[in-house]
Amino acid sequence: MFNKTMVATGVAIAVAAMPVVAEEGSFMDELEISGELKNESAIFTKSGTTVGAASAHDNRDMLKSETSIRLFVNGLAGESSEWHAEIRPVRDTQAVDGYKGHENYSQQDFLRELYVDTTAGEDDAVSLRIGKQQVVWGTADGMKLLDIINPTDYREMAQNSMDESRIPVWMVNAETDLEDGSNLQLVISQPRENVFAGLNRNINTVARVNNTTNGGDLTTGSGHDQGHAFMMKGVDTITGKTNGFLNIAPDIGSVALGFSGQFTAAGLQGTTNMTVAQFQKMTNAQLNARPWPASATSITGAIAGGSDGTQIMNAFAGNYDTNLNAATSANDYAVVKDSAFEYMDNATFATFDAFVNASSQYTYDMPSDSDVDAAVRIKRSLDNGLNYSLNYSYNYDKNPIINLSWRGANDVELTPTETINHFNGAGAVVAGTGVAGYAYSTTTLTLADSGGQAYGAVAGLAPTLRFEQTVERAHNIGSAMDYAVDTESLGAVVLRGEFLYQKDVYQPVMNLDKLSIGNLTEALKMEQTNRFKYVLGADITVMTNMMVSAQFIQDRNLDHIDNGNNFTADYATMHMTNGFNKAEENKEFYSLFFSKPFGAEQQHRWNNIIMFEENGGKWNRFDVEYSFNDELIGMFEYDKYWGDENTQFGQLEASSNLQLGLKYIF
């Protein structure tokens, strides 16, 4: 496997070099060991509830208490090679489970780096770095465009430095200088994906199902990474305890079980003439006027108690801890849609027959360790001062996608079929929309395998809604350039740009019409798109030594979908509370970055970056490093998020925080 091969290669070279080193002294004498011991503690600076959290926090509550060691070890590997290792034990006592300590392929990986530097070819013209490492291609402030060789750990959004948040992977990194002065770089690397709170490789893959006899809730506490301060709404929609459809699906299955026998004695399959909205909008008097079968004891008992349709629905849904039905009465049902049954308003009760005792399951279809990503870059500096690079990679896209499907026995895929029926005002079937007495139509969903075997209560077979996490290959073609211009008033101004065209990446596409009839697998689909992203920046130095950098950033979705209720959703913020937030076709960001040393010997430094996001999201980070001496450094950082709550930054307003740290260098 790829990673084991790399480990073996690095270790073998180091071991082979030991006798050579031993000729001049002990192995340990030849090692260079340095490092840093650091503690960072953070508090919330705003009371509130972070996305998906079960309860609110108060201002000044602890967010983080992380102690870590970064140990750097360098040694010789033969006469012309060297090896390097970075080891980082870490513990955060305030983190949620899964984030407290070591985690492979994350920011807290115990073995951050392990590689060998050597040369090959005639006159050692090719420099090789083999092993676990980072390769940095992009230099934009606050975001990554060309910097896509390594994945990123977004456990603290963009607060951590690029060096800290970048996830090292195993790779072969080869560079050589060409005759015209250009530098050619080839990277063959292990494919790994970005890591987000709530969307990673630690999600429980056991099927989630409630009691199939009495509908008892057996899936409580199933939210992934609940309480993490940097959970985003888009992730909460997938794996969140309350709003995540991974956990909503089995609860819908249990509510459907409760419906059985309530509308007809024979079950739900024949109830094609009533939708969720029709039922929930009924007053108590309207319900009381309808005939109910003798088996409908739950409904008739509630009617006798004065309940309307929404209140009866809440009696069924209230037994579960997910966001099934937020309305409180027939008067406010779906006035503002923010719960599952409000979005599934056109689903018939016959559709719920297919959902009876449904389960859900999270699965992974990720690249194996024998798969590789490939990237090549050529960069050059011209005599006129222009520096540029041309970049290409064919890699698994770093952002994971989620594919939904219904599954049956032996993992067979089920096909949803929509059937339209027409009715008169009394709910009796009519032949079509043009016949006398026609009043309304409904669409009923059924599930069956390729052999025609139906699933549902009548069939006696329960389906499973699968959430499959995967990544897909994409082509990335990019360029970076910078050029210094001397001006009379501002001095030297560095103009720079990064440009990236991505082919065959994926976007989440939401279809609210499909969701309204309960066709969940067609409601959220991942579809191919092409994107063009770029950053234009300018850097100047003012007030003797203060660096000022301004950036304009745009992400253009070249296959954006905006067709009424069928649209490209914003992956970061799509949520039941905002109509699954439609994405911008051309998303823009603006940033300003300031950096200045201070002190008698300019030994301290402060930095400030502020980013403005289209539609009103804002983030500002102010940080200071204060050197008490050469070994001891104090750190201060304040991160403030604010603005529209349905933006990437604005949704994190309750996560605003202040951090204090102390770092000892040895």
Task: Please describe what each predicted stretch is.
Residues 39-45, 89-93, 134-136, 188-194, ...:
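Transmembrane beta-strands of outer-membrane beta-barrel pores
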Residues 78-222, 639, 643:
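Outer membrane beta-barrel
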Residues 61-67, 107-112, 166-170, 370-374, ...:
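Residues that define the transmembrane beta-barrel architecture of outer-membrane proteins
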Residues 151-154, 592, 653-666:
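Outer-membrane beta-barrel "beta-signal"
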Residues 27, 75-79, 120-122, 166, ...:
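Outer-membrane beta-barrel strand-turn architecture
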Residues 31, 79-83, 124-128, 181-184, ...:
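Repeated loop/turn-to-beta-strand initiation elements of outer-membrane beta-barrel proteins
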Residues 69-75, 113-118, 172-176, 376-380, ...:
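Residues on the lipid-exposed face of transmembrane beta-strands in outer-membrane beta-barrel proteins
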Residues 24-50, 83-85, 606:
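Transmembrane beta-strand segments of Gram-negative outer membrane beta-barrel proteins
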